[in-house]
């Protein structure tokens, strides 16, 4: 089973990934493959992602991590994929591993909340200004991440909750998915919004 976590920058994907690892689930980060390729070519990561998709198609990054995903699936039977950016990548995984084997979990937070989180987080590629933040969102949306979010089987809203509360929401969703028990979540896996 593949659990694909998607969301705009600062929504909380990283925390979901941490919880998944705590639950013993291996994680494949698509951005790591892009970073490796960028380093190999001596390019900026954002430019590398764009170039890969131009050179090899919109599902290029999914194809780059396919071996890692297969290895982790053989080892653990489940893997979290962090970093799907467009519908073509999602469809690649669904075609390769089976429609019913892929669960999409979207993490949602408002733009204002995400901007504040990114400013506090302070990673090298995080925006310093509202304008930089908006440009980054536009770039992400341009890749097609909004289309992937709209196809989510599960949506976790990460607004007005403490970090421990959000992490518990993530844990609840992960455990329900692993049990294959949508009844553990209100509304099942069909575009679920985990209650605030």
UniProtKB/Swiss-Prot annotation:
Entry's family note: Belongs to the UPF0200 family.
Binding-site list for ATP: 7-14
Protein name according to UniProt: UPF0200 protein MK0400
Alphabetical keyword list: ATP-binding, Nucleotide-binding
Classification via InterPro entries: NTP_hydrolase-rel, P-loop_NTPase
GO molecular function: ATP binding
Lineage of origin: Archaea, Methanobacteriati, Methanobacteriota, Methanomada group, Methanopyri
Listed Gene3D superfamilies: P-loop containing nucleotide triphosphate hydrolases
Species per Swiss-Prot/TrEMBL record: Methanopyrus kandleri (strain AV19 / DSM 6324 / JCM 9639 / NBRC 100938)
């Amino acid at each position: 089973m593949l659990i694909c976590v998607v969301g705009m920058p600062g929504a909380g994907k990283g925390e979901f990934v941490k919880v998944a690892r705590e639950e013993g689930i291996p994680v494949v980060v698509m951005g790591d493959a892009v970073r490796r390729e960028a380093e190999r070519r001596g390019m900026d990561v954002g430019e590398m992602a764009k170039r890969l998709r131009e050179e090899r198609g919109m599902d290029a990054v999914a194809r780059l991590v396919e071996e890692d995903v297969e290895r982790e699936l053989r080892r653990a039977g489940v893997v979290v994929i962090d970093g799907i950016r467009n519908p073509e990548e999602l469809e690649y995984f669904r075609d390769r591993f089976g429609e019913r084997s892929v669960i999409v979990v979207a993490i949602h937070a408002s733009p204002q909340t995400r901007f504040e989180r990114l400013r506090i987080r302070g990673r090298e590629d995080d925006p310093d200004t509202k304008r930089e933040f908006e440009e980054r969102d536009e770039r992400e949306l341009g890749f097609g991440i909004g289309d992937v979010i709209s196809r989510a089987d599960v949506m976790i809203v990460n607004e007005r909750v403490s970090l421990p509360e959000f992490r518990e929401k993530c844990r609840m969703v992960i455990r329900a998915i692993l049990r294959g028990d949508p009844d553990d979540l209100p509304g099942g896996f069909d575009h679920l919004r985990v209650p605030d």
